[in-house]
Amino acid sequence: MSDIEIKSSPPESPAEEQEERRLAGRKRARAVDPDEEDDDTQVVNNQDEEKDPKEDDGEEGGNAQAEGADEGEDDEDEDEDDDDDDEDEDDEDDDGERRAKRRRKQKKFRFLDVEAEVDDEDEEEDEDNDYGDVAEFIDEAPEDVGARDDHQHRRLNRVFGRNEEEDVHDIVQRLKERHAGAARYNGDSDAVPQRLLMPGVNDPSLWKVVVKSGREHAICASIFRKVFAQQYSANPIDVISVFCRDSIPGMIFIEARQSASVSAAVNGIVGIFMSRGVNLVPIEEMAPLLKMKKKDVNLTPGMWVRMKRGKHAGDLAQVVDVDQITSGVVGIKFIPRIDLTPREKRKERIAIGKPGGVRPPARLFAYDDVRKIYGRQSVRQGAQGSYLFDNDEYVDGFCIKDVKIPAVATEDVNPTLEEISRFTGDDDSTAKFDLSAIADANKNLSTSLLFPGDKIEVYEGEQTGLYGIVEAVSPDVIAIKAEGGEVHGQTVEVPARSVRKRFDVGEHVKVLGGKHTDASGMVVEVKGDIVTLMSDLGEQEIKVFSKDLRKAADTTNLTVTKGLYDVHDMVMLDSTTAGVVTKVEGGLLRILDQNGAAKSVSPEQVSIRRDNKRFAVATDSQGNDMKVGDNMKETDGEMRQGEVFNIFRSIFVFLYNREYTDNFGVFVARANSLISVTPKSAVNDLTKINPALNQQLPYGGASLMPAPTANLNRNRLINTLVVVTKGTSKGLIGVIKDVQGENARVELKHNNKTLSVNLASLKRKDQKTGATFPLEMAGIASAAGGYGARPNAGQYDINPYGGATAMHPSMGGQTPALMGGRTPAARFGQTPNPYAAGVQNGKTPNPYAAGVGGKTPSAANASGGKTPAWGASGGKTPAYGMASGGKTPAYGMQGGKTPNAYAMAPPGPSGGRTPAYGAYGRPEASGSRPSVMAPPSAPYSAPYSAPTPAGNGAPTPAIPGNPYTAPTPYGAPTPYAAPTPGMPSLSAPTPGPGAGIAPTPFGAPTPYGAQSYGASAQQQRGLPWDWALDFRNVIVEIGPSYRPGSRNPLHFKRGFFDGKRFGYNDIIGENVRAILLDDPSVVEEIPAEYLRPAKADSQGQVVVVIGGGPEQKGQQRTTQYENGGSWMMELEGGDMAPLVVDGADLCRIWKV
């Protein structure tokens, strides 16, 4: 650029020049790239430092001045003016550029001084000027440490000297003045004063609502949930709080501003009495409702308390450990309640739905008993003879346990003397008590037991030893008139808690409380709180608390009353509750009521019950009768046993066993939970004493009146185990307790409730196998037994003679009773008998016999052969239609038929046959002959005989007028001389050709059939078909099958082994591998349905019990004496009485 151009160029304005320099300075102050190391940075810095700041900053101005100097002196003045302006601007730019240079540090060195800067003199001057105003503030002179230390020590010495010179009171006063204004910390200092917390008229009100007592907490919770559920709804409930107080039962308190909100909150909640209204609590009563007075519980070792919760609720306990009382835990000692019910019984009780939470009795811990029930591993032995069981420690029979203090009650404990005596190990009232152990029991004597005139003494406090007569009684203070000492005759007030009653030896007193209530006697000894007196009546010593005594006035009436009662007498506590006297203690009767609760009552509180021990009877769990004097035992629970000494309403049985100490050996049990210790015979047949069933009518002809309904003996069904098959209770198991018409009252097993169920909805339940069978009723074939029928016709059979085994051979063929072979026999089985039933069968004709017509022969109430009778199934000779024809004797269910002219086409099932071609008969070429093995029941009572040609051959001429009255023509009679071949025990000849009664021919008696197996003894006894599978090493007999619904042949190997005896030891499925006793080389695999037990026939035989109750089933005994079909067994160790077993329940042992 030339000088002319420079000169002609106008000078730049200061603002533009400043802006340009500012931009140039910003460019120079750019951030250094991190890749550029210290070398580049150092070079730049050194160059900047070597330059003069003025030259650097005014580089452009300097060049202009140099050029201006060369121009000449004409422009000198103008240049000087410009230089002055430029210098001012340069001075301003110097500071900006200097600051820019200092800010050119890297970001990572913002807080580190990593380079040294060389300041020039101008900067030093500037810094001096910057700190000029504070230059005198810091003393830079070095500090004299020694002088300062000496000064402080002298000051400390002056303080010590001054303290020594000052008086102590001055120091205290000065300290008080110094700290008088300091606020001492107080826990309640931040609390608002109580007067400011009192509610006012602007605060929410408190409303009182009456509720059901005991449900206060539940109702409060319901209100909480209701308010919370509606708080975000369109209509929230404006309730602020709700609470209840345990000390105010039956009320809750709700805080709200309006009563409408309270009504909305409680509306619809169960347990609130809205009829009482919603009441406003006054303002002055609101604050006391929220105050809680804390009670300090003072527990000391040896103190008596009572448990509040669990199965031990109400039990007395003693404090033994208070070391952890600060943690809210106290150690106590009490008598445990351990359930000693056998494990199997507990499982059965749970399986049938009975409650398992039965409260066991309180008894001391016995290691052997617990180990027997729960096993050895459940009990561990601890230190010093203690035991650990179920996480609890037991010492000397007592349970030692740590419980929370709220779990025990410390007030109103009032332990009785008998409760405390159990802690001493003796429950006898005459026992020697440890007085120190019961010293606290009588400490707090209630003032309600004190009356003016009582003698008392002070036993603790400053007035210990003072005694006198009570003059006035108040809740906490008692005024007495002192006797003896310095205050004799003066009235002295003493604390009520420090006094006790005082009695003198020889004084006559009466007991007010405890188990000896109303007893009276003379004081013979006084030791502290225990007074010993001699009873007026029992002449025995009684120990009672002094607080329970009072001076007696009159006992004459009591003496007369006590003579009315004796031990084990039954008394009535009220109109529905009975009990027995367990002990007579002076003026008190110890009673055990029907619910098992022991009570102590006075004779005036009970009434004696008429003695009915001779007539009292009940039914046990197996349906057997029990009476006074029988030895019974429980079937569940504690399995106690004892002798029956009284029975109440045939339900509650009172028993006595002197080995039991509780309640002096007396306990009570329900009759249906007992079983006889000694075996008993089957239940008696009450139909034998029913005159309606045994009524006999004189001879007479048949009647066309309708047959009367059978009188079913349904009492046989009582105590039968059944299962409900229909209705809402389907599947439930129970026991029939009563039969009323067509309904039965069934007591369910799982909850002991009684339901009324129709008999058609019940089925019998086998206790052993669990199988179900129809109930056996009168008038049906299953009641009579027979082939294919369930062998349950023993205990519950309506007709005990139906399908019975043939009579003994010595009795001959009998029709139908045990009076020899004659018809009629002493009005038994007479012909005709229109009203006879049961054993009075074999009648010709009989229009009213249990709805099945006259029968010849007949068994039980089945439809035997009938000639003639009423109804479609009656005996008809001949009959029109019905395919039944006249029947003589029975053909299956319809009987054998005398030729019927109107029968079905040949060869029809109703062909006339005389005698019948039985259901199990087979044709024989020789014609009719007696049966070799006659089936036992009516449906199969025909013998094995040759059939008379069936069809229309040899028909008896019929009169078609009235088919039911057409007589058999005289010219074609049923053979007169030939006897009717019938069943072994109940057979009768066919009536002969006469108008009267056909006698039984003496020359041709009713033939005696061989032994029948259809309804054998084990069927009557109720043995199942598979009984043999439960036993081994027994002797059995072979006979026809009696398994219900069996598809096997009737006889095993066509009857080849019938009547043979086998012995077996091996069981294969439902078969046994048996060896023939007559020929041991014969080994057969026989199904169990063909096996009968071999009966005992002489004494000295070893047998096993295969039937009866569970207490005797499976026992192996030796026969000793037989009487009436029952065997008495030889006594064995532990037998209380001889064992008598029915012969049908015995089976001989094979290999002894």
From Swiss-Prot:
It comes from the Eukaryota. Residues 34-60, 68-95 have a biased composition (Acidic residues). GO terms for biological process: mRNA processing; regulation of DNA-templated transcription elongation; regulation of transcription by RNA polymerase II; transcription elongation by RNA polymerase II. Residues 939-966 have a biased composition (Low complexity). Gene3D superfamilies: 2.30.30.30, NusG, N-terminal domain (3.30.70.940). Its main location: nucleus. Transmembrane segments: none annotated. It is found in: Nucleus. Belongs to the SPT5 family. PANTHER family: SUPPRESSOR OF TY 5 (PTHR11125), TRANSCRIPTION ELONGATION FACTOR SPT5 (PTHR11125:SF7). This is Transcription elongation factor SPT5. It comes from Cryptococcus neoformans var. neoformans serotype D (strain JEC21 / ATCC MYA-565) (Filobasidiella neoformans).
